[in-house]
Swiss-Prot record:
Annotated function: Component of the ubiquinol-cytochrome c reductase complex (complex III or cytochrome b-c1 complex) that is part of the mitochondrial respiratory chain. The b-c1 complex mediates electron transfer from ubiquinol to cytochrome c. Contributes to the generation of a proton gradient across the mitochondrial membrane that is then used for ATP synthesis.
Cofactors, names only: heme b
UniProt name for this protein: Cytochrome b
Transmembrane segments: 33-53, 77-98, 113-133, 178-198, 226-246, 288-308, 320-340, 347-367
Annotated a ubiquinone binding sites: H201
Protein's UniProt keywords contain ATP-binding: no
Annotated Gene Ontology cellular component terms: mitochondrial inner membrane; respiratory chain complex III
Gene3D superfamilies: Cytochrome Bc1 Complex, Chain C
Amino acid sequence: MTNLRKTHPIIKIINHSFIDLPTPSNISAWWNFGSLLGICLIIQILTGLFLAMHYTSDTLTAFSSVAHICRDVNYGWLIRNLHANGASMFFMCLFIHVGRGIYYGSYLFKETWNIGVILLLTVMATAFVGYVLPWGQMSFWGATVITNLLSAIPYIGNTLVEWIWGGFSVDKATLTRFFAFHFILPFIIMALAMVHLLFLHETGSNNPTGLNPNSDKIPFHPYYTIKDALGFMLMILVLMTLAMFSPDLLGDPDNFTPANPLNTPPHIKPEWYFLFAYAILRSIPNKLGGVLALLASILVLIIIPLLHMSKQRSLMFRPISQFLFWLLTANLLTLTWIGGQPVEQPFIIIGQLASILYFTLIIVLMPLAGMLEDNMLEPKFP
C-alpha cells in the first residue's frame, strides 16, 4: 500500500511543505520567525473571531462593547489582551524576520521578498484599522490624523479623504467600514502568506552562509518541526506573560477615554510598531513631503535587491556591512523613541538626522560597503 502522505492530493502538498521539505542543515534560530508569524496570524484570527462575536461597530456602543467583553464575557479580558498584545508580538516577529532577510541576503529571492513587502504593508493596514475599533480617544484621533494625510495628494486628496470617511469627519460610517476591513484583511494576509511560501519553496531556503546549500539538506520533519515547536512555546510564554501581568504596557492611556471629537489629546501617537514611520513622517515640515517619506520608509524595502552590490550574499563574512546593519537597527530604535516624543527641540533635530541616516544607510552606505569589501578581497599582485 502506498503511503497516503505521499499520494493524497491535499496531504501531499502539506507533506512537501512541512514534512519532506529539503531544508539547509545550518539555518539558525533567526529562521524561526516565519513560522512564528504563522502562529501569530492564527492566534490573531481566532481571538479576533471571538471578539467580533461580542463587538458592535457603532460609535455609540463600540467603547461600551469592548468594556462589556472585558467585564461580562467568559475570559473576554484574556481574549482581548491576547489580541491586543498579539499584535505587538506579530510586529516584533515581522521586524526580526525582515531584519534577518536583510542581514543574510534573503531578498535575492525577489518574488518571495516582494510578496513579503506587500504582506508587511497589508499587516500594517490591518493593525491601523484595528486600532480604531475600540473607539477611544487615541483610536479616533489616530484615525483622523492618519486618514487626513491623504488630503496631501494633489487634486483628488480632499475627495479621497471624504470618500474613505464616508462623510465629512471620522464617524459611524468610518468605524463600520474599518471593522469590515479589519475582518477581511487577515484572510487576505493568510492567502498572501501561502503565495509567499509557494515562491519560497520554488527556490528553497537561504542559510546563514549565503552559499548554495543543495549539497547538505535534511528533511524539515523532525529536525525543524521540533525547533519550530520550541519557538512557539517561547513566544506563547512571552505573549501570555504580557497579556496576564501587564496587558496595558504597550497601549496608550488615552484609549481608556471614550472618543470625543471636541477634545484633542495632548500628544497624538500611534502604537509603538508605527512610531519609526511616524517619526519619519513628522521630520519633514511639509505635508505631502512627509507622506512621501512615510511611504518611502517602507517601500524602500522593494529596491533593496537592486542595491545589492556585493559578490557575497550574506553579511556573515562582511564586517563593514555588519556594522552598518547594526547602525541601521540602532537608528530604527532611535526613530521609535523619537516618534513617541512631543514635537519640540531637541527631538525635532534628532528625528530629522535619524530619518536622513535611515535612507542614507540603506540607499548609499550599504551598497558602497559591499563594493568596498569586494575590493578589499581582490588579490593585489605587484
